[in-house]
Each structure stands twice: as structure tokens, then as C-alpha cells.
Amino acid sequence: MSCVSSISSKRSRCEGFDDDFIHTPLKKCSKGYHEWSLSITTPATTPTGKLDYKRKTKSLDDDLISSPVKFGTDANVLNAEFQELSLQKLLVSLSTSDDSKSNPIFHIPELLHRIFNFLDHESLYRCSKVNPVWAAVASSIINKDLVIQQSSISGDLKIVELDQKVHPKSLTFYKLKQHRNFIENQLPRIRFTRLNSLNFYISPVLPAIFDDVTISNNLTKLTIAGNKKINDEELISLILGLPNLIDLDLRACSQISDISIVSIVTHCPKLQSINLGRHENSHLITDLSIMALSELEHLTTVGFSGCDKISDVSIWQLYSKHSTTLVRLSINGCTQISDSSISDIVAKHGFPNLKVLDIRNCQLVRFKNLIQYRDWRHKYLMKPIHIHISDSMKKEFELQEQQLYKEFRTRIVNDLNRWVNEAT
């Protein structure tokens, strides 16, 4: 019986709660809100001043009724009720900021230099406006290497346009086939007094605009790669005032001929590296160019890829003049070069300081001398050499290599047998 009475009492209480909830939805909440008072302070959150709590006896029903967010209220009405409300704007000005309060770590030039090296030129320019220390570090990086390319031409030239002191050591134009007028307008803002490296990568419209610009005669590197429009006359006029040129890259400049090369040798006596590789108009570079280049005293790197009019005569000429100084030799695609030059020269242990030899697509069939030369360099001189061969040559090269090692092992066995027989 006790269990039945307990269940009945619980059911009656629940039914009473349901009735209250149905007829007065906020009655119990309002009652609790009525009794709640702000007269008792909590030390952690309650202000210590005198506060007016006139709303402490206000019911939650009244709060909901007087709230700006009325049920069914139109959005325009809601906006009108809030239009007088505004947020206080916090204005932060770099010009008025106190640098002395910033973290001292951001005033260490060496650390800033390491961080700034990861930024593009437009970001560097913004950093240069923060304070004098940042300006000095950013300027040193900008002035070291200025790269102008299609994807960021506006950002790069903004630096030139706004900074009157841009005098880079290296200036590179990368894949610019348009914007000639824009660049011509900004070019006078660049100072070329410290320039030692000038590079044009697939930018055919640019070299001609330097006709009216005085380039420093201290320029040591000039790259005009992928320019099919520049001719002998334009190139010669560009290099006339460059007596200290050391590195010249003319890859894929298909209009350049022997005439330019002879002029380069005359006006650039300090030249050490030249690349004449091409895929078109290969007949314009002949043995005459190599004969002229071999007269350069400091020549170390030569590239003739695709120049199929160059013959064994040129290789022998290079050997006679630069046997000990040549470091890199690329004759990829020079189909007239045969075993009569390369194989015979390495058999004499010629070019002992050569580090890279590219003989892809040449008419070579005797590789034993090259293999022995490579092993000799590695074992006795401790100067490894990288020999690049084409896929069509690889099979024959490996076959001759295996045969050579087999002969070597046979010779060792014969020597051991002879030694044993002599001992007995």
C-alpha cells in the first residue's frame, strides 16, 4: 500500500506542475527572478561603487516584453532601434607608436635579416616603413637582389616607384613579354652604379630598353636566356662597356652568330663562363667561335649544346689551350664530335680538373677510355667527375663497363698465378 500511495503522490505533483506550466508559462521563473537580489555582492565580480538596481524586482515576463527583439518584429524596425548604437573604434597608428615599448628581439638586425629573407619584395617594402631598424634591414635585402616577374610586377615596381634609393646588386627580369612602357617609366628610378648581375629570362622586349641606360662597368654576370629576337648588333652594343664581364649566358638566343662571339672575346677579356646552347639556327655557331673563345685566358666553363656544326677540331683546340683550367664542358647534341677527340683526350688524362662532362647525343661509341678516366680521377686524384650520357648510349656504356671490369679481374687472377708460380 505504501508503494501505491507514493506513486500517487508523485503523479499528483507532476500533474500539478503540468497545470502550472500550461496556464502560466513563466510563473515559476518569474517568482524566482522576483526573489533574486543584487544586494549581496561577490568580491570577484561585483563593482564596489554605488549601483542603482531599480530593475531587481522586474519580472522576466516584463523583460521579454520590453526587449528590442520583439517576437515578429520586422528587421527594418530592429535596425532602426539599433542605429544609434555604435562601437568605439580603436585606431592604431604606426607613426605614433612607441618603438621603445616593442619587444627588444625585433631590434636585432641579424635576426630580422634572417626573417626578412623569406618575404617577397612588396612585404619587404611595407616592413621598411615600421621603424629605422626595419628599414635598414629591408633595404639591404631589396638592394641586393631585385626580381621583377609577370606574377608580381606591380609589387616589385612599386618599390622602385616609391623608393628613390633602389640600387640593387642583382637585377632580374623573369618571363616579361609585355609591360615595356611601364618598365621604361620606372627604369630611370633604378640606380645601376652597384649592379654586378643583370639577368633576362625569356624577356625578349627588355634588353633593347637599356640602350639609354648607363650600366656599371663593374657588371660581372649577364644572362639573356630564351631571347629569339636579339641579334648580333644589339648584343655587341650591350657588351661594349662591360670589360669586367665574367659570366655570359646566351642560351636559346638563336639569332646570335660567330660575329658576336668574336666581339665578346675582344671586349670581355676576363670572361670565364659562356653558354651558347640552342635548338634553332645551330649553324650560326661554328668552330670559329670556339677558336676565338679558346684565346680567353681564364676560360673555365663552355656550353655548346645543340651546336651541331662544332667538330673535333674545336675540342682539340680547347685541350691545347685549357687542358688544366676547364671545369665544365657541355657538348650535348654536337653530332660532329666523335671518339677522335673526347676518347683520345681522356686517354691522355687530359682535362684533369673537369667536374662535369655532358656528351649526350654525340657520336661516341668507345667508352672504355671514359670509364678508365672516371675511375682514375676518383681513385688517384680524389676528384670525381660527372659524365652525362643519353639513354641511347647507356646500354653500350654499361656493357663496355662490365667487360672492362671482367678484363681487370682476369688480369688480377693471372698476376696472382704468376706470382705463385714464381714463388714455387
Swiss-Prot record:
This is Antagonist of mitotic exit network protein 1. Negative regulator of the mitotic exit network (MEN), required for multiple cell cycle checkpoints. Required for daughter cell separation and chromosome stability. Involved in copper sensitivity. GO terms for cellular component: cytoplasm; nucleus; SCF ubiquitin ligase complex. Pfam families: F-box. GO terms for biological process: cell division; SCF-dependent proteasomal ubiquitin-dependent protein catabolic process. InterPro entries: F-box-like_dom_sf, F-box_dom, Leu-rich_rpt_Cys-con_subtyp, LRR_dom_sf. Keywords: Cell cycle, Cell division, Cytoplasm, Mitosis, Nucleus. Belongs to the AMN1 family. SMART domains: LRR_CC (SM00367). SUPFAM superfamilies: F-box domain (SSF81383), RNI-like (SSF52047). It is found in: Cytoplasm; Nucleus. It comes from Kluyveromyces lactis (strain ATCC 8585 / CBS 2359 / DSM 70799 / NBRC 1267 / NRRL Y-1140 / WM37) (Yeast).
